[in-house]
Amino acid sequence: MKIICKWMGIALLALPTLFATNVMAQVLKKPTLEDLLPGGETYRIAENKWYQWYGDAACLELGIDSIKGIWAVNGVGAKAGENFTVITLKEANKLLAEKELGKLRNFYSAKTINTPHSAVIGILLQVDPLLLLNTGKYRVLIDWKKKELIWNQPCPAQAANEDWNEVSRHLAYTLNNNLYVMTNDGQTRQVTTEAEGIVCGQSVHRNEFGINKGTYWSPQGNLLAFYRMDESMVTQYPLVDITARIGELNNVRYPMAGMTSHKVTVGIYNTETQKTVYLNTGDPTDRYFTNISWAPDAKSIYLIELNRDQNHAKLCQYNTETGELMATLFEETHPKYVEPQHPIVFLPWDNNKFIYQSQRDGFNHLYLYNVKGELLKQLTQGEWLVQQVLGFNRQTQHVIIQSTETSPLQSNIYSVSLKDCKRSLLGNSEGIH
């Protein structure tokens, strides 16, 4: 009897271990190729993509059930490094339900409004605590501190190429080939009434030369520059839409080599007068108009004109009221080609100076100009590329760039002084930043 009890005790002690081993055997899974390859169904590289800035005060993380934040500076009732909850999905949907404006499933499409409400106080960007949300049927603004829904605008059905301005809260969009504007109070205005073959408010020139859209709001959002592309003279090319259950014919206009190309003009629509002025650029035949940018006061607009041979570019300034050419600031030529890819960027602290990007020395670099078209200095140089202008440090008067200076296999962030052109590496020097 004692022997039996002894073995029973051993068996009882072993049961938990056997049970745990059995559970582990059920949980453990051999990884498959699909599990280990990026882009597979069960594996993806972690990306810090759901983040927004609340002015210079805090960084917000957009999530499914809530938006979290961390204070970046010491403020009223907060310390740098402290975490806080901006708003929950339950709170947001309650505000939406009260006005029957739809429902959110997550906050991934939320956007902070970082327009200064009182310019720049000290060195920090002061902004209102507003979140732009889209339910699919309505675009809404929520004051996340007061937990109040302060504004809404219906989303136009079948709209494409939407371009919303956070200052005026006007929305530019296209229906088929024409351009429309919905004002901040929900009024719909048709800006163009063109027939088939003429496209307005959409990307032109086959998305070359940095063009990726067709509308450009002025800084205050009361003027809208847009492309008008006449391609009625371009031969149609048949393509088959294979996404349909039964293949469908889709004719597109494509200028083959040596054949007639489309003609592009640039219009400026005034939301207050509801009138449109077209820039007097002359005959648009075999010319490209690219890299549109506004002067800070919106009294003039800048663009780069390029010939069809793509070896002669001109930076031109036009009057936004009359559409007349005010000045050709400078020209750039090359025996083979020039490739303007970026609009000029004005310095936040000086409306009379701007940064121009060019590959004139064989590598894409930054050049500082004044509004008279005079080259003040070359800000960056070397056998490497400036990939992006990311922003500015107003306090130190530096421009922040992404470049390949460390290695052509890497992208690193640098701070460049506009005073002496010295560069400082931000963060470590390894990897993609």
Language-model segments: residues:
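Positively charged n-region of N-terminal signal peptides that target proteins for export
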Residues: 1-7
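Bacterial N-terminal signal peptides
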Residues: 9-20
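Beta-propeller folds
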Residues: 10, 24-433
